């Protein structure tokens, strides 16, 4: 039986820059060849004009209505980081960041790269702050770094997810104060705890040896922690029950691993796949091809296209696309016997450096997929394809249908 290899370029969609996009410019003969034999279209990850987060977009792409199942990013980040959430736990996505002397954010990612010894120093600080919070508020704090500047913070105790973010989501703005979004005592306590952690981290960071070393090398200090997406783990019907599809995901980023786990996918990682713009994909693609013999759908997440977009790096984004395509090339004959789908979870235009709401290109190849006349995978070409304009939530039912796994609606 054939299976599906699904390549997802995170933030891969873009706007024309000088009349061209990274997908259009990139030399990607394998993807373009399969595109020429398949059917193309445009994809609204959620719905037209909606700027998706990576969390809500992946829920939709995996076949789950985010308006029904989304309870906050933090829970998926925690699950992907290997933290098993208990009932009542509230989790947040964190960014290590840089602020100036007045508390204004000047870099939401503290230069993005965080060395292993810097990660250890941050985790030691957070452990001490956690002890203070436990004594002061009776709330347990669990903190874990994930990739680069990213991390997860879990609060355990009489807490609530109904608090606002401290992350201002843009530079040039002060770190926000968490505020309760409800009238309950738990929300008020949670906001107080979050604000305490935020203030204490900046106080403690001033004396860290790692920041002296970073200053000496011209790197921005790690002197703030930004929290966002407070949430709890929702109850989700596994994808194997909802769509009768046995699925696996290969990802280096905690958020994507967490969403995949939450919907019941088996999750793998691979050498070279760390969730950065410098990822190398040979081992990940090899693993994906091997897993195709065991699963109906194998999903491979490529983070680098989003990271380079947020950095405004057009050529870097092109390079990520080309590295992935080069890794696919040795397996072309195998791919031709199976199904192959490529798309993005959202657009992150290099010129904007943020998620935007326009549709992204989509291509679907299969031995029995009716081809159209599109020969190149790009925003500038896929709009002419036979698939038309789809939503993210349409993808899994389409794949299940081609695999012969979907149930008939009606008699």
Curated annotation (Swiss-Prot):
Q: Give the catalysed reaction(s), semicolon-separated.
A: (2R)-2-phosphoglycerate = (2R)-3-phosphoglycerate
Give the main EC class.
isomerase
- Pfam family of this protein, just one? Metalloenzyme
Q: In which pathway does it act?
A: Carbohydrate degradation; glycolysis; pyruvate from D-glyceraldehyde 3-phosphate: step 3/5
Check the record and name the CDD domains matching this protein: iPGM_like
Q: Which domain of life, per UniProt?
A: Archaea
Q: What is its EC number?
A: 5.4.2.12
Give the UniProt record's GO annotations in the biological process aspect: glycolytic process
What keywords were assigned to this record? Glycolysis, Isomerase
Give the signal peptide range: none
Q: What are the annotated disulfide bridges? A: none
Q: Which GO MF terms are attached to this record?
A: metal ion binding; phosphoglycerate mutase activity
What this chain does, per the record? Catalyzes the interconversion of 2-phosphoglycerate and 3-phosphoglycerate.
Q: Which family does it belong to?
A: Belongs to the BPG-independent phosphoglycerate mutase family. A-PGAM subfamily.
User: Which PANTHER family does the UniProt record give?
Assistant: COFACTOR-INDEPENDENT PHOSPHOGLYCERATE MUTASE, METALLOENZYME DOMAIN-CONTAINING PROTEIN
Quote the HAMAP family the UniProt record gives: ApgM_A
Its protein name is: 2,3-bisphosphoglycerate-independent phosphoglycerate mutase
Species name: Pyrobaculum calidifontis (strain DSM 21063 / JCM 11548 / VA1)
The record's gene field reads: apgM
């Amino acid at each position: 039986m054939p299976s599906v290899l699904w390549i997802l370029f995170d933030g891969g969609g873009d706007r024309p820059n000088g009349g061209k996009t990274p997908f259009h410019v990139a030399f990607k003969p394998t993807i373009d060849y399969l595109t020429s034999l398949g059917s193309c279209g445009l994809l609204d990850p959620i719905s037209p004009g909606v700027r998706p987060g990576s969390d809500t977009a992946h829920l939709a792409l995996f076949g789950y209505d985010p308006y029904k199942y989304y309870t906050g990013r933090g829970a998926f980040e925690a699950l992907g980081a290997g933290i098993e959430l208990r009932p009542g736990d509230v989790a947040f996505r964190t960014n290590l960041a840089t602020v100036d002397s007045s508390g204004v954010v000047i870099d939401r990612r503290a230069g993005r790269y965080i060395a292993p010894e810097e990660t250890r120093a941050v985790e030691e600080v957070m452990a001490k702050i956690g002890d203070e919070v436990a004594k002061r508020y009776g709330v347990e704090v669990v903190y874990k770094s994930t990739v680069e500047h990213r991390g997860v913070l879990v609060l355990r105790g009489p807490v609530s997810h109904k608090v606002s973010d401290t992350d201002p989501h843009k530079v040039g703005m002060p770190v926000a104060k968490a505020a309760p979004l409800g009238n309950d005592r738990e929300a008020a306590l949670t906001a107080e705890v979050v604000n305490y952690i935020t203030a204490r981290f900046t106080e403690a960071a001033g004396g860290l040896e790692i920041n002296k070393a970073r200053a000496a090398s011209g790197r921005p200090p790690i002197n703030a922690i930004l929290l966002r997406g407070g949430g709890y783990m929702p109850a989700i019907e596994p994808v194997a029950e909802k769509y009768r599809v046995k699925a696996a995901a290969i990802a280096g980023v905690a958020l994507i691993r967490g969403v995949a786990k939450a919907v019941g996918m088996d999750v793998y990682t691979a050498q070279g796949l760390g969730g950065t713009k410098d990822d190398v994909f040979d081992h990940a693609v090899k693993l994906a091809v091997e897993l195709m013999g065991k699963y109906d759908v194998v999903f491979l997440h490529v983070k680098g296209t989003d990271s380079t977009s947020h950095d405004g790096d057009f050529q870097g984004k092109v390079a990520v696309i080309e590295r992935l395509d080069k890794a696919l090339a040795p397996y072309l004959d195998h791919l031709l016997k199976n199904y192959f789908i490529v798309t993005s979870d959202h657009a992150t235009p290099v010129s904007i450096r943020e998620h935007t709401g326009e549709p992204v290109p989509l291509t679907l190849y299969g031995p029995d997929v009716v081809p159209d006349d599109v020969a190149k995978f790009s925003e500038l070409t896929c709009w002419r394809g036979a698939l038309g304009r789809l939503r993210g939530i349409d993808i899994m039912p389409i794949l299940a249908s081609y695999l012969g796994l979907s149930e008939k609606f009606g008699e």
